[in-house]
Curated annotation (Swiss-Prot):
Annotated NCBIfam families: asp_carb_tr, PRK00856.1
Functional description taken from the UniProt entry: Catalyzes the condensation of carbamoyl phosphate and aspartate to form carbamoyl aspartate and inorganic phosphate, the committed step in the de novo pyrimidine nucleotide biosynthesis pathway.
Native organism: Aliivibrio fischeri (strain ATCC 700601 / ES114)
InterPro entries associated with the record: Asp/Orn_carbamoyltranf_P-bd, Asp/Orn_carbamoylTrfase, Asp/Orn_carbamoylTrfase_sf, Asp_carbamoyltransf, Asp_carbamoyltransf_Asp/Orn-bd
Cellular component per GO, a single term: cytosol
GO biological process terms on file: 'de novo' pyrimidine nucleobase biosynthetic process; 'de novo' UMP biosynthetic process; amino acid metabolic process
E.C. numbers: 2.1.3.2
Gene giving rise to this polypeptide: pyrB
Family: Belongs to the aspartate/ornithine carbamoyltransferase superfamily. ATCase family.
Binding site for L-aspartate: K85, R168, R230
Annotated positions binding carbamoyl phosphate: R55, T56, R106, H135, Q138, L268, P269
Protein known as: Aspartate carbamoyltransferase catalytic subunit
Domain of life where this protein originates: Bacteria
Enzyme class: transferase
Length: 309
């Protein structure tokens, strides 16, 4: 298969084809089975996180080092020239990309990754999250996890639960799965946190089936994947938050009618939307999902920085 990802900016999921997504998933599986310690030998990757991150930053840096690459960068913008001296993001990107073979960036501003790609002098930019916009590498690890647990990416029933309005992970994953055949979505959220209209309109245009469901219990018996998200407390007053939160807590009891193959995923961190009693069920897969972030990011970096593998 031709590697069309070589030297490509990874900014958003809609810009990746089904074939490219499958190539990343396939490569992640190979690397998980057979580690490749030299694929980034003599490569330098800039890891620049302008806002806090634990799993994404550490899994990227682990991925780089396990492939034999070197990491430069920062985990907070507070001590950079950008913050201390008023340097523009464009200037910062131009300088840092001159030092590195790839530029991994998380930024609170929507569109920051695309801006970076315009000033990177051809150095590939990988979006590690830009505000509430896109988080493509989370989607890649989600796709790999779904494939690992289900053996396919076609013909799946997938539910998203919780904050579907602001949750960039569910937006990106919906757009990715929409590239495959026979997908049916269940969107389970309070009206104030419903899936954005533009996502539903995209699905309508593609003729993809989806249902707006009020209760998890109504959907669970049909599901292959149950993707939980955190309802963000800061968006509600106390009484409203307490009501909404209680309606979207998953317990082991909820999973009793589930299919044997159902897996529960979560981008983490969880607060209390998944009871700890779920952890001991065969359906829980969110910790393995987080671990898969390393393999998915290894695959992406290897493909972006190597014309052939």
């Amino acid at each position: 298969m031709t590697n069309s990802l070589y030297q490509k900016h990874i900014i958003s999921i809609p810009e990746l084809s089904r074939q490219e997504l499958e190539l990343i998933v396939e490569t992640a599986g190979k690397i998980k089975k057979e580690p490749q310690p030299d694929l980034l030998k003599n490569k330098i990757v800039a890891s620049c996180f302008f806002e806090a991150s634990t799993r994404t930053r550490l899994s990227f840096e682990t991925a780089i080092q396990r492939l034999g690459g070197s990491v430069i960068g920062f985990d907070t913008a507070g001590n950079t020239s950008l913050a201390q001296k008023g340097e523009t993001l464009a200037d910062s990107v131009q300088i840092i990309t001159s030092y590195a073979d790839a530029y991994v960036m998380r930024h609170p501003q929507e569109g920051a990754a695309r801006l970076a790609s315009e000033f990177s002098n051809g150095t590939p930019v990988i979006n590690a999250g830009d505000g509430a916009n896109q988080h493509p590498t989370q989607t890649l690890l989600d796709l790999y996890t779904i494939y690992e647990t289900q053996g396919r990416l076609d013909n799946l029933n997938v539910a998203f639960v919780g904050d579907l309005k602001y949750g960039r992970t569910v937006h990106s994953l919906t757009q990715a799965l929409a590239k495959f055949e026979g997908i049916k979505f269940f969107f389970i959220a309070p009206e104030v946190l419903a899936m954005p209209d533009y996502i539903c309109e995209e699905l309508d245009e593609l003729g993809i089936e989806y249902q707006l469901v009020e209760s998890m219990d109504d959907a669970i018996p049909e599901l292959d994947i149950l993707y939980m998200t955190r309802v963000q407390k800061e968006r509600f007053d106390e009484s409203e938050y307490a009501h909404i939160k209680s309606a979207y807590i998953l317990s082991a009891e909820n999973l009793q009618p589930a299919r044997e193959n159902l897996k529960v995923l979560h981008p983490l961190p969880r607060v209390d939307e998944i009871d700890t009693d779920v952890d001991a069920t065969p359906h829980a897969y969110y910790f393995q999902q987080a671990e898969n972030g390393v393999y998915a990011r290894q695959a992406l970096l290897a493909l972006v920085l190597n014309e052939t593998l």
